[in-house]
Amino acid sequence: MIEYIIGVIGLLLASVQDFRSREIEDYIWIVLAVFGILFAIYSAITLSNYSILINSISGFVICFILGYMMFLSGIGGGDGKILIGLGALVPKFQMPIYTSLGTLLNLNYIPNFPIMVFINGIFFMVFLPFVILFRNILNGARPKTGKEVILMFFGEKMKVKVAKEQKRLIMGQNDKINFFPASDDEDFSKYGDEEEIWVTPQIPLIIPITLSYLVTPIIGDRILDLLIPF
């Protein structure tokens, strides 16, 4: 249980950092991974059960591979690193299983818990527009048109110089709004650095992952069972 609590603390801290600055400090996933392996060594010795240590190491390795694949897919380096940390920290945790995929993931030395946390987290992304809305409100964005009301849920308003640094795509300004910008919509030359424009949001995946981490011990793979029964 202590590993799970450490995971909660790490994810909450990562969520705050991601929400405020869209950056997650590396020390979080490193602490999760190091604590996970050290605690697994301690538990394996005191309980004379070395499968605990094997699970932690295999969880680290498998989640490292998955996290690297996430990075190559452009999903987010910070989110993938958190997965690596959780793989070492809580590779296994009690949760209900309803699907054949859940049964497969429940095999020995497969980190079924962090994988299921990330799967459920993807489904919880349906709530992300409300996270974006809340962040826009905190940043002082106030819609002046009907289009900007919609953008409060699906875009972010920021200064041009910040948008350029973060390589965002331009969605527009005032009534000149493009809800589906293409990759070439990054010509900031027509705006001043201090102007505020609407740009594409950076998806804070770690927030739905944190929510998933809290509820997955209760629901297991029930969402998969309801939406994609197999």
From Swiss-Prot:
As recorded in UniProt, its EC number(s) are: 3.4.23.52
Give me the Cytoplasmic side stretches, as residue ranges: 1, 47-49, 90-110, 217-230
Alphabetically list the UniProt keywords.
Answer: Archaeal flagellum biogenesis, Cell membrane, Hydrolase, Membrane, Protease, Transmembrane, Transmembrane helix
First-listed, main subcellular location of the protein, grouped into a coarse class: membrane
- Record membrane topology: Multi-pass membrane protein
**InterPro entries this protein is in?**
Arch_preflagellin_pept, Preflagellin_Peptidase, Preflagellin_peptidase_C, Prepilin_IV_endopep_pep
**Which GO terms of the cellular component aspect does the record hold?**
plasma membrane
Where is it localised? Cell membrane
What's a single GO MF annotation on this record? Answer: aspartic-type endopeptidase activity
In this UniProt entry, which residues form the Extracellular topological domain(s)? 19-23, 73-78, 140-204
Q: Which reaction does it catalyse?
A: Cleaves the signal peptide of 3 to 12 amino acids from the N-terminal of preflagellin, usually at Arg-Gly-|- or Lys-Gly-|-, to release flagellin
TM ranges are 2-18, 24-46, 50-72, 79-89, 111-139, 205-216
Q: Name one GO biological process term.
A: proteolysis
Q: Which PANTHER family match?
A: PREFLAGELLIN PEPTIDASE
According to its UniProt entry, the function of this protein is described as: Cleaves the N-terminal leader peptide from preflagellins.
Family under the similarity heading: Belongs to the peptidase A24 family. Archaeal preflagellin peptidase subfamily.
Output this protein's name: Preflagellin peptidase
